[in-house]
């Protein structure tokens, strides 16, 4: 389920960096759209406008290609009964997603896909409710029973009906604006400490480095938002599939996560500085026990 967030953020960083590089090169060649003053300083308002344009173009471009990127990077095989014959299990998966989608009020059915992976995972993505994708791992279908699968699918459909990807795109656009603005200022400061003939190349390299670093730091804001929205998707999933199935799905995920943690405990411990704080900051999902507790109290 974290795949959706990580794919979106990775795509955003790549798109944002590419747009920034292209615009910077064009600006240096043509002089159009530059935020530098005649004396080599920075015009804050011009830089802010530049940052807003780059930031939101980057986030909405990431949203527009999110479904294609997910299929490409995860190797998702779309299940289309009109084009290919499906196995009984595959047809059942498509029927479940479509049934839940109709119950949620969607008028255009999401694409449904499977990707090969032993992990127990699923995600929903896409630029709009009418152009969405629900994908599940082969490991999820192999290790979860029908009730748990139903809960997971309902959770992912709830993400689509809640419009979480669009809201996240707006948030990412704001984060991107700060990233672009601060990275340009930091790069400009760095270029002031070298010889004048080296300043342009230092500014360019520093800009790329600072933009990537600030993008990673900015992703913490997106992660925090994602954790908040998971509770809403859990409630939406409970409304669609039933509270018992949603809780059962989360308990199954918890059981799976516990087995993985036990298998990898030694390796994980050697990398920890403060495991609890680190995982809470960089996690896209809240603690499973807390999610179960909130659903039980619903």
Curated annotation (Swiss-Prot):
Keywords: Cell membrane, Hydrolase, Membrane, Metal-binding, Metalloprotease, Protease, Transmembrane, Transmembrane helix, Zinc. Binds 1 zinc ion per subunit. The keyword Nucleus does not apply. The chain crosses the membrane at residues 5-25, 45-65, 170-190, 204-224. Zn(2+) binds at residues 155, 159, 230. GO terms for cellular component: plasma membrane. Its cofactor is Zn(2+). It is an enzyme of class 3 (hydrolase). Its EC number is 3.4.24.-. The active site is at residue 156. Pfam families: Peptidase_M48. It is found in: Cell membrane. The keyword Magnesium does not apply. One of its GO terms (biological process) is proteolysis. It is a multi-pass membrane protein. InterPro entries: HtpX_protease, Pept_M48_protease_HtpX, Peptidase_M48. GO terms for molecular function: metalloendopeptidase activity; zinc ion binding. It comes from the Bacteria. Belongs to the peptidase M48B family. This is Protease HtpX homolog. It comes from Bacillus subtilis (strain 168).
């Amino acid at each position: 389920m974290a795949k959706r967030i990580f794919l979106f953020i990775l795509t955003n960083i790549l798109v944002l960096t590419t747009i920034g590089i292209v615009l910077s090169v064009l600006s240096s060649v043509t002089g159009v759209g530059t935020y530098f003053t005649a004396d080599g300083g920075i015009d804050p308002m011009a830089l802010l406008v530049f940052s807003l344009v780059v930031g939101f173009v980057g986030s909405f471009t990431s949203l527009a290609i999110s479904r294609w990127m997910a299929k490409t990077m995860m190797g998702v095989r779309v299940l289309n009964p009109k084009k290919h014959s499906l196995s009984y299990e595959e047809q059942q998966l498509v029927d479940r997603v479509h049934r839940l989608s109709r119950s949620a009020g969607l008028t255009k059915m999401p694409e449904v896909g499977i990707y090969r992976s032993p992990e127990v995972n699923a995600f929903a993505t896409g630029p709009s409710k009418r152009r969405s994708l629900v994908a599940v791992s082969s490991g999820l279908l192999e290790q979860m029973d029908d009730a748990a699968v139903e809960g997971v699918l309902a959770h992912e459909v709830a993400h689509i009906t809640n419009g979480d990807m669009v809201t996240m795109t707006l948030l990412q656009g704001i984060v991107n604006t700060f990233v672009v603005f601060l990275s340009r200022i930091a790069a400009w400061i760095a270029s002031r400490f070298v010889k004048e003939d080296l300043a342009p190349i230092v500014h360019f390299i520093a800009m790329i480095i600072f933009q990537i670093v600030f993008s990673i730091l900015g992703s913490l804001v997106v992660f925090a938002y994602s954790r908040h929205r998971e509770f809403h998707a859990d409630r939406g999933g409970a409304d669609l599939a039933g509270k018992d199935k949603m809780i059962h799905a989360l308990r199954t995920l918890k059981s799976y996560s516990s087995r993985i943690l036990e298998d990898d405990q030694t390796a994980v411990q050697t990398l920890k500085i403060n495991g609890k704080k680190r995982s809470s900051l960089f996690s896209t999902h809240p603690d499973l026990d807390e999610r179960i507790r909130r659903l039980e109290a619903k």
